Amino acid sequence: MLDQNEPTLTRRRLLQMGLAAGTAGALNLLGGSAADAATVKTPAAKPKATADSVIVIWLPGGVAQTDTWDPKKFTPYVQGMKGGDILGTCPSIPTSADGIRLGAGLENIASVMDKGTILRSLTNKTKFGAIHLKAQYYMMTGYLFPAGVEAPSMGAVVSRTLGRRDPNIPAYIDIGRDINTSNEEFLFINEFMGPGFYGIKHAPFMIPEPAQGLPTLKAVAGMDMTRLDRRQHYLEAITGLSAPALQTAHPVKDYVKVMEDARAMMDSPVKRAFLFAEEEKPETLKAYDVGHRFGFGCLLARRLVESGARFIQVEYQYEPFGGFDMHADGQSRMKAMKAQIDRPVAQLIRDLDQRGLLERTLVIVMSEFGRTIANQPAAGTEAFGFAERSTGSDLVIQNEKMYGFHGHFSSGNCMLFFGGGFKKGFVYGKTADAHPLLPIENPVRLEDVHATIYKALGIPADTNYVTEQRPFYVTNNGKGVPIDALLA
C-alpha cells in the first residue's frame, strides 16, 4: 500500500517497492521466509583434505558396465543365441595397471588406469533405482526423489561448504548441459543439478558450449565498460535501500551477488581459460576434439582447474533413447559412444598429471546405473516387445539390433576415480561372471561413496545445514561412512 503522506513517489522508490514485493512473493511460493535461511551446525572432526578440486565426468543414460569398466567374457553375435549367453559384446583389453582390464574401444583410458581406481560394486536397491531421472537425482544428491526438501547436488555441497578456491571463479561450474530448453525432462535435470535449498549463490555457473567460450563475459556490443559499471551501480542503489522486506530477503541479495560476481569475472584473468583454441598446441586440440562438445568440455575443465576452479561437472548431454541410453542396437552404439569419451577423458588425466595437478584434483567418471541383457526398448523399434525388466536369459537374439545390453541395471554400477588421494591401479568390488552379474564382493552404498568423496575434500560426512527447523546432511541422513579402502 502506498504511503499517502509521501509527496513524491520516485522511480527509485517504485523499483525498491517492486523488488521487495517480488521477493516476498517468491518466499511465499517457496513455502518459507527469510527466517528459514539454512544455518550450519557443528559437524564431526574435519578430515585432512587430499583434494582441492573436483572434476565430475557425468555420462548419463546408463553406461553398459560389461562393455566398459567391468568387462566379462566376450560372446560374439550368433543369430538365434540366447540372451543369457551374452556376457560381453566386445573383447577386453589390458591396461597400464597390472590385472585390470577394460572393454575394447577404451585403449586411451586403459593407458592411464595405473593412475586410477575402479569401483565395480555400487548398488542401488531403491524403488526407483532403474528410472533415469530419479536415479540421476539420487546419484547427484544422495537422496531419493522426492526428498521433502529440494536436495543440493554434490557441486552445491562443495560450493557451500568449501567456497571458492579463486575469488574470480565460481565454486560450481557445469559444462555441456543444454539450458535453453522447454523439454520437461531437461528442466527437471536443471533443477536437480542445482543448489537445492542452499539458494542461487550455490547454483552451477553454466557453460553450455565450451568451444564457443562464454559470450556473457563480454560487454554487449556498443556498450563500453563505463556504461556497464553505471548499470551495476544503479542495481546496487536499488538493492541497498532500506525496505525491511528487501534487506532481509536472502534470495534477492543472493541474485545481486551473482550479478556482481559475473561483472567481476569480466575483468579477471579467468577469461583466458576459454582461449584454448588460440593457446593450446594443435596436437592437444586434436586429442580432445571428438566432434562433440564433450571433448572440449574436458579440455576447458583442465584449464579452469589450472585457473583455480573448485568443482566442475562435464556432461555428455542426456538424450532419452540416445547417447548412452540404448534400448536397441547396443553393441554398435556402445562402440560409437566409447569413441566419444575415450580420448578426451584420458587426455584430461594425462594433462593434469603432467602439470602436477592430478595429485590434488579428484576426477570422477560416473553414470546413473549400468546395463543388463534384460530389455526395455523404445516403442517402434525392432527390439520392441521384450518383457520389461525380464531377466533376458531366455530371449532369442534374432538380429544384431537385439545384440547388446539394453536393460536398466542399478545393482552393479561402476565408478572411476583418478587423483585426489584415491589409490592408483586399484579395483574395489567384484561382480559375478554369470547373469544377473550382481556384486559378490564388497557391495557399496551410494552414501558411502559420497562420504568418501567428501572426506577427500576435507568435508565430514555428517556436515549439515538446518532448513525447516531440522538438519539436512550432505550424505543421506548423515549415515555415509567413508570407504577408506579406496583412499591411498
Q: Model-found features: residue ranges?
A:
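Ligand-binding pockets and gating/stacking loops
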Residues: 1-488
